[in-house]
From Swiss-Prot:
Protein localization: Membrane; Nucleus envelope; Golgi apparatus; Cytoplasm
Bias (Polar residues) ranges: 220-229
Glycosylation sites noted in the Swiss-Prot or TrEMBL record: 57, 274
Function, in words: Nuclear envelope protein which in association with NUP205, may be involved in nuclear transport of various nuclear proteins in addition to MYC.
Quaternary data: Interacts with NUP205.
Keyword terms of this UniProt record: Cytoplasm, Glycoprotein, Golgi apparatus, Membrane, Nucleus, Phosphoprotein, Transmembrane, Transmembrane helix
Annotated coiled-coil segments of the chain: none
Regions of compositional bias (Low complexity) in chain numbering: 133-157, 260-271
The name this protein goes by in its record: Transmembrane protein 209
Transmembrane segments: 28-48, 60-80
Organism of origin: Homo sapiens (Human)
């Protein structure tokens, strides 16, 4: 109970919160009080010494009134702060709680008063005559399986330390929790009553160790009726008898709930996790809620994050050598997505459509053996020479397919990559499954396929060069694949160098410098982006005599403005 001003309806938690706020405010008001005293002292010193008026040569009497008002204000604030500090220190809020409540509320010993547990009296009071107003009220009987003759009665000796609002009784001495009937001495002390204490009660809301569990709350608040005789042998006179009775009744009630179909959750029973019972009691429920071990991640997240961070830092270093701007890496994801979409919409989708169109024309011409994806690359090259007047696009298609002898896999993989809008099935260090078997190194990786079609597309856009009669102008000048090596000492060499096949890795050679971007799934795309970025910023958007901007190939739009 609070000392000083205390509202009778204030709860224990509210008073605890108020006490903690006062403890915190005590430090703050002391600091404010010292600050206000300091300010008032400074102003008083200025008033006596007239420092400001003499230094600035101003009229003193208006300034004196202003200083007087400020000094008075700070002095009053200081007095108020010191009064609050004195109040919180000398007459703090205190509580009377039990040791259990002190532990739960996290209170210090210096600010609370603990009350020892009260002994239960063994006083027995004879039963009172039944109340005729609630005869026959037994529809809310606690347990249908219990015999009326085996239900003991609660006496007021079991409620020591309470100021309860006792509730009504049923006929034959049966105690009821009827909220409409209030307790009176005439109704008898031997009836089971509501254990809800009145707010101003100075005692803890516990009845010894029995009431320490929250599971006993239903005996205080549930609308339950006990039909039993009023023999003196049925009265409870000590805690042991009460505890035994509560345990047995809880056991019965819990078994009923576990066996009922409505018990679908372990949390539906308020007594589920209380007491040490056998696992068999909960077998029915635990079958519905089985715990399963989670699968351990193959790669620790911390290692992955560290690898991503180091990869990003390495990429920043490489890009800084090209553009002197580390902020470019913030746009890299956007550029990569646009570039992948450009490859898909500009090269892959039209290529698949043209291949299907040529295959249809081959069937109409009576050459089903020359179906693209079924015929060998040698047969397709010969057909391109023979049937060039009839199918002029066949020679161009053959250039895209001249990558691997396995034409069936190559065509099917190009079709898969063209689906999804942004090459969603792309795998940088492998490819797709083929005829029910996993990808192996005898098949080209997706990176090799994309690099090949990209170079072939630019071969078709660059003008013919007499030095490269096969028509591979871009591939011959700007793409080198191991085991061949570019001439790094030549300042005019500007090419993409594939330094590893499996897993694929690409580097950029420009003006005797090697730009080696981090390995991984985006290495090829980032190398190509750097190649195009150099063309845009250092070559005025020109690749030889071809403009890669809006008036030409129109690929530099991916970098924005």
């Amino acid at each position: 109970m609070m000392q000083g001003e205390a509202h009778p309806s204030a709860s224990l938690i509210d008073r605890t919160i108020k006490m903690r706020k006062e403890t915190e405010a005590r430090k703050v008001v002391l600091a404010w009080g010292l600050l206000n005293v300091s300010m008032a002292g400074m102003i008083y010193t200025e008033m006596t010494g007239k420092l400001i008026s003499s230094y600035y040569n101003v009229t003193y009497w208006p300034l004196w009134y202003i200083e007087l008002a400020l000094a008075s204000l700070f002095s009053l604030n200081a007095l108020f702060d010191f009064w609050r500090y004195f109040k919180y220190t000398v007459a703090p809020t205190s509580l009377v709680v039990s040791p259990g409540q002190q532990t739960l509320l996290g209170l210090k010993t210096a600010v609370v008063q603990t009350t020892p547990p009260h002994d239960l009296a063994a006083t027995q009071i004879p039963p009172a005559p039944p109340s005729p107003s609630i005869q026959g009220q037994s529809v809310l009987s606690y347990s249908p399986s219990r015999s009326p003759s085996t239900s003991p009665k609660f006496t007021t000796s079991c409620m020591t330390g309470y100021s309860p609002q006792l509730q009504g009784l049923s006929s034959g001495g049966s105690g009821s929790y009827s909220p409409g009937v209030t307790y009176s001495p005439v109704s008898g002390y031997n009836k089971l009553a509501s254990f809800s204490p009145s707010p101003p009660s100075p005692y803890p809301t516990t009845v010894g160790p029995v009431e320490s569990s929250g599971l006993r709350s239903r005996y205080r608040s549930s609308p339950t009726v006990y039909n039993s005789p009023t023999d003196k042998e049925d009265y409870m006179t000590d805690l042991r008898t009460l505890d035994t009775f509560l345990r047995s009744e809880e056991e019965k009630q819990h078994r009923v709930k576990l066996g009922s179909p409505d018990s679908t959750s372990p949390s539906s029973s308020p007594t589920f996790w209380n007491y040490s019972r056998s696992m068999g009691d909960y077998a029915q429920t635990l079958k519905k809620f089985q715990y399963q071990l989670a699968c351990r991640s193959q790669a620790p997240c911390a290692n992955k994050d560290e690898a991503d961070l180091s990869s990003k830092q390495a990429a920043e270093e490489v890009w800084a050598r090209v553009a002197m701007n580390r902020q470019l890496l913030d746009h890299m994801d956007s550029w990569t997505a646009k570039f992948r979409n450009w490859i898909n919409e500009t090269i892959l989708v039209p290529l698949v459509q043209e291949i299907e169109s040529v295959s249809t024309q081959m069937r109409r011409m009576g050459c089903p053996e020359l179906q693209i994806g079924e015929a060998s690359i040698t047969s397709l090259k010969q057909a391109a020479l023979v049937k060039a007047p009839l199918i002029p696009t066949l020679n161009t298609i053959v250039q895209y397919l001249d990558l691997t002898p396995n034409q069936e896999y190559l065509f099917e993989r190009i079709k898969e990559l063209s689906q999804g809008g942004c090459m969603s099935s792309f795998r940088w260090n492998r490819g797709g499954d083929f005829k029910g078997r996993k990808w192996d190194t005898d098949l080209p990786t997706d990176s090799a396929i994309i690099m090949h079609v990209f170079c072939t597309y630019l071969d078709s856009r660059l003008p013919p060069h007499p030095k490269y009669p096969d028509g591979k102008t871009f591939t011959s000048q700007h793409f080198v694949q191991t085991p061949n090596k570019p001439d790094v000492t030549n300042e005019n060499v500007f090419c993409i160098y594939q330094s590893a096949i499996n897993p694929p890795h690409y580097e950029l050679i420009y003006q005797r410098h090697v730009y080696n971007l981090p390995k991984g799934r985006n290495n090829m795309f980032h190398t190509l982006l750097m190649f195009l970025y150099i063309i845009k910023t250092k070559e005025s958007g020109m690749l030889g005599r071809v403009n890669l901007g809006l008036s030409g190939v129109n690929i530099l739009w991916i970098f924005g403005e």
